Swiss-Prot record:
Function statement: Electrogenic proton/amino acid symporter with a high selectivity for the small side chains amino acids glycine, alanine and proline, where both L- and D-enantiomers are transported. Extension of the backbone length, as in beta-alanine and 4-aminobutanoate or methylation of the amino group, as in sarcosine and N,N-dimethylglycine, are also tolerated but decrease transport efficiency. A free carboxyl group is preferred.
Annotated gene: Slc36a2
Native species: Rattus norvegicus (Rat)
Disulfide links within the chain: none
Keyword Endoplasmic reticulum set for record: yes
Name of one Pfam family that matches: Aa_trans
Protein name as catalogued: Proton-coupled amino acid transporter 2
Residues spanning the signal sequence: none
Tissue: Expressed in lung and spleen, and to a lower extent in brain, heart, kidney and skeletal muscle.
Sequence ranges of Polar residues compositional bias: 29-40
Cytoplasmic side: 1-56, 101-146, 217-220, 284-295, 365-377, 424-444
Amino acid sequence: MSVTKSAGSPQVAATVKLDLVSFPESAKKVQSQDPNPVNGSSSESSEKTKGITGFQTLVHLVKGNMGTGILGLPLAVKNAGILMGPLSLLVMGLIACHCMHILVRCAQRFCHRLNKPFMDYGDTVMHGLASSPNTWLQSHAHWGRHAVSFFLIVTQLGFCCVYIVFLADNLKQVVEAVNSTTISCHKNETVVLTPTIDSRLYMLAFLPVLGLLVFIRNLRVLTIFSLLANVSMLVSLVIIGQYIIQGIPDPSQLPLVASWKTYPLFFGTAIFSFESIGVVLPLENKMKDARRFPTILSLGMSIITTLYIAIGALGYLRFGDDIKASITLNLPNCWLYQSVKLLYVVGILCTHALQFYVPAEIIIPLAVSQVSKRWALPVDLSIRLALVCVTCMLAILIPRLDLVLSLVGSVSSSALALIIPPLLEVTTYYGEGMSPLTITKDALISILGFMGFVVGTYQALDELIRSGNSLPLSNSTMFIQ
């Protein structure tokens, strides 16, 4: 969380090259904590001149939210109803955006109070607990930081694992269907797949590319890849959108509100589609003019929520009860609509580096601080390479990885996005006086987050038990953003 940054700083052109020459950003953060005033001034000046612009921040924010989960939202709307589904998505978008604003405000408050240039999620929670009126929370405040760091690492690396599965599965589907793919898109013919190599070999094939991408440690350079990912996914969504609006049948047969028994399925799928709170403070910390961040945050979440509602509602209107787990499975088997999968492969490939950035900025400074400046860069790059290899190996070795990660994500994602922020607001401002309405609001949001934890955990456990004997080596990615 940055306090003073020049709004008029010249925009630095981002160049597509690996930032391997300069000293690692993570090492710079460690140095910036040095009590030596010379080092501190130099680091702060560097941050002012090399921060990211408002547009770059918006690009990263949109990309941090828009992942594979949007493809499953039409089925989620089916489980809620054609009226209840879009309304619920709107409410979830507003709550998620509000929780992000809470986190930013609390971080700003402690930066001003403690005279610090920036503050991450873990620091903010630690100082929030330290300022609470409860003595037990004050004495155990450091555990709040450790818990947040653990949740962030598990969640973000979990996304990276599932992205590898998504890349391999979608490329494999396109290759296997290539012989039956036609030029004409007027008929939705049955696809006869031609068996090819195992999907796990596709995962290994992506590993060298992912290894190069995670070496990019500069958010300004990552903007190029985030922009490419946004364009790829936007084009694919436009292709999907133009198809589903061509033949929308009479919607009067669709239920306005679905059965309460299926609503938890909607809730469990939709709540994790808004999971990007882990990238909020890292982006805000890197901005040249952090005062503009709340506006950019609201704009970005408005774009995401609108896209979610449009794809979810229109997809269900078009296909009704025939909607599949991923809307791409309802598209005709022609090259135009097969290209949607290829575009998403490009988009997710570029997204991997951004999701990897958050856990890297937590883990690497701890290791770099233990070695001399001479070894900082080799240690930095070695840890990045080791982490991406671990995520690839987990994707290869663990059957039904998506369900295992959905189980873990039910705890960590709900805690990070909905449970911790409102409780953090209470611990931060309670001593200064809070209205009963604000306390009630924060309590209700935390209860909603806890419901997401319970529903998501039940859903993942149920799927794990039912799939134990049926699809032991199947990996799907519908529950992870």
